[in-house]
């Protein structure tokens, strides 16, 4: 069954570079689940290095990172060891070895032509609902700043029940929910709002 925004994220139990984990272990936390096409590849290596450099930024937001590809656990270990030896970066988050492709297929992350995982990202909220998803082309690396911005926008919605307008950054005003009655809509106009359907905090 395909994964949809606003629907429950499929649970899984998997072998990783940090031991066996289940998605259900992460209840009450935000989760960033991301897949990469293959170990020992240039773009994926730059992404893992940057995710690790920004690891504390995610932790401060109560976000747990989980990587995934269809490479073997031994391949993951050798690759992460190489990153540590060559770049001095320790990968602190678990990387799933999904060699049977079960999890990748659950999350629609398999390139059936190539047989490997695509470059996908899912943000899963503390209720284990999929709140954000994006796929990048194989030749395009992820924008970690934009992923962090999206996490912060979703968390603003979670805690303050607001929506975030175009190019929203933390500290900017959010958009309040639409009016539920005609009187509420007219009141917004009387308050000087340009439209009844857009009102900021």
UniProtKB/Swiss-Prot annotation:
Active site: 44 (cysteine sulfenic acid (-soh) intermediate)
Every Thioredoxin domain range: 3-156
Keyword Metal-binding annotated: no
Pfam families attached to this UniProt entry: 1-cysPrx_C, AhpC-TSA
GO cellular component: cytosol
Biological-process GO terms, alphabetical: cell redox homeostasis; cellular response to stress; hydrogen peroxide catabolic process; response to oxidative stress
Keywords on record: Antioxidant, Cytoplasm, Oxidoreductase, Peroxidase, Redox-active center
Residue numbers binding substrate: 119
Subunit composition and interactions: Homodecamer. Pentamer of dimers that assemble into a ring structure.
Function: Thiol-specific peroxidase that catalyzes the reduction of hydrogen peroxide and organic hydroperoxides to water and alcohols, respectively. Plays a role in cell protection against oxidative stress by detoxifying peroxides.
Additional note from the record: The active site is a conserved redox-active cysteine residue, the peroxidatic cysteine (C(P)), which makes the nucleophilic attack on the peroxide substrate. The peroxide oxidizes the C(P)-SH to cysteine sulfenic acid (C(P)-SOH), which then reacts with another cysteine residue, the resolving cysteine (C(R)), to form a disulfide bridge. The disulfide is subsequently reduced by an appropriate electron donor to complete the catalytic cycle. In this 1-Cys peroxiredoxin, no C(R) is present and C(P) instead forms a disulfide with a cysteine from another protein or with a small thiol molecule.
Protein's name according to its UniProt entry: Peroxiredoxin 2
Species the sequence originates in: Picrophilus torridus (strain ATCC 700027 / DSM 9790 / JCM 10055 / NBRC 100828 / KAW 2/3)
């Amino acid at each position: 069954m395909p994964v949809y925004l606003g629907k429950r994220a499929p649970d899984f139990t998997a072998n990783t570079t940090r031991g066996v984990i289940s998605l259900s272990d992460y209840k009450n936390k935000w989760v960033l689940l991301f897949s990469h096409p293959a170990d020992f590849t240039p773009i994926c290596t730059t992404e893992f290095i940057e995710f690790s450099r920004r690891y504390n930024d995610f932790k401060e937001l109560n976000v747990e990172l989980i990587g995934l590809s269809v490479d073997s656990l031994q391949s993951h270990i050798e690759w992460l060891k190489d990153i540590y030896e060559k770049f001095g970066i320790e990968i602190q988050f678990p990387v799933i070895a999904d060699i049977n492709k079960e999890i990748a297929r659950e999350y629609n992350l398999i390139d059936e032509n190539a047989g490997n995982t695509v470059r996908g990202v899912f943000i899963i909220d503390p209720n284990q609902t999929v709140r954000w998803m994006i796929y990048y082309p194989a030749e395009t690396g992820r924008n970690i700043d934009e992923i962090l911005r999206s996490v912060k926008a979703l968390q603003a919605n979670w805690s303050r029940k607001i929506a975030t307008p175009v190019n929203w950054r933390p500290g900017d005003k959010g958009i309040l929910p639409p009016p539920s009655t005609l009187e509420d809509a007219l009141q917004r106009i009387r308050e000087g709002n340009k439209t009844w359907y857009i009102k900021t905090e």
